[in-house]
Amino acid sequence: MENRNTFSWVKEQITRSISVSIMIYVITRTSISNAYPIFAQQGYENPREATGRIVCANCHLASKPVDIEVPQAVLPDTVFEAVLRIPYDMQLKQVLANGKKGGLNVGAVLILPEGFELAPPDRISPELKEKIGNLAFQSYRPDKKNILVIGPVPGKKYSEIVFPILSPDPATKKDAHFLKYPIYVGGNRGRGQIYPDGSKSNNTVYNATSTGIVRKILRKEKGGYEISIVDASDGRQVIDIIPPGPELLVSEGESIKLDQPLTSNPNVGGFGQGDAEIVLQDPLRVQGLLFFFASVILAQVFLVLKKKQFEKVQLYEMNF
């Protein structure tokens, strides 16, 4: 009897452990799937549209600056840095999903030329690893190694993101050529205003869906509001739901118009995109250029020596 009770207890504990594990997985998966840049990866085959617009701007409506810095030229099969700067006021707080205030996160997408890719760990120097920190980059798609994404990560620590990039070698990759290539980048700070399904997040302004009078404002237990708007002409009632986060701008009894803001705009972040150019330089061309410069310098030296020799001859003839 005791053995049976022990077995039942063990079975119950195992069942609980499995249930807890499943719950953690679901919560974690939901959190990850709702994070930038997963939205873009799930909804778009290519993050850069034909117009040049990066798709992240579809959800992050405010425009903010970014800056990209890359070398002017690189040699084949060389690791170099692509530095993305996402500036913002570190004192700012954003509205989180639960309506509370918190620090801003940042994220980025780097679109490299075909053949360029994330440098393997064994090719990254200790100095470069220190600059990168604990960032974990990933490819936009398994077959698009030239498009890298990162985020969301804490903005206070990673407002400057260093990408370790490996340049291609045309000797081993037929698609690579010694040319000038464009590099495109997009970076955001803070949460977006619209989800991919078109619904609003709580990090944006909410407008009235009807003209009328605010009859009642009900504050919900978990935060947010239900605003009852009655149309004075026909008595039709509309209820607008406001999630936790935005601050209410209207009061009961107030007359409002269609699309009038009911709340403030809590968004303090935004998205920006930029571009740069990089040259994949042929080593033979560099060697030829160096040889040319050396030849010019030697020619100048010989010319000076010849001139001095000629002056000495002239001086000698004059004295003679």
From Swiss-Prot:
Binding-site list for heme: Y36, C56, C59, H60
Domain of life: Eukaryota
SUPFAM superfamilies documented for this protein: Cytochrome f subunit of the cytochrome b6f complex, transmembrane anchor, Cytochrome f, large domain, Rudiment single hybrid motif
Chief location category: plastid
Intracellular or extracellular location(s): Plastid, Chloroplast thylakoid membrane
Bilayer-spanning residue ranges: 286-305
One GO cellular component term: chloroplast thylakoid membrane
InterPro entries reported in the protein's UniProt record: Cyt-f_TM, Cyt_f, Cyt_f_lg_dom, Cyt_f_lg_dom_sf, Rudment_hybrid_motif
Annotated S-S bridges: none
Membrane topology classification: Single-pass membrane protein
UniProt keywords, alphabetically: Chloroplast, Electron transport, Heme, Iron, Membrane, Metal-binding, Photosynthesis, Plastid, Signal, Thylakoid, Transmembrane, Transmembrane helix, Transport
GO molecular function, one term: electron transfer activity
Cofactor: heme
Entry keyword annotation includes Nucleotide-binding: no
Record-level GO BP terms: photosynthesis
Signal peptide boundaries: 1-35
Family in the record: Belongs to the cytochrome f family.
Function, as annotated: Component of the cytochrome b6-f complex, which mediates electron transfer between photosystem II (PSII) and photosystem I (PSI), cyclic electron flow around PSI, and state transitions.
Quaternary structure note: The 4 large subunits of the cytochrome b6-f complex are cytochrome b6, subunit IV (17 kDa polypeptide, petD), cytochrome f and the Rieske protein, while the 4 small subunits are PetG, PetL, PetM and PetN. The complex functions as a dimer.
This protein's name: Cytochrome f
Organism: Triticum aestivum
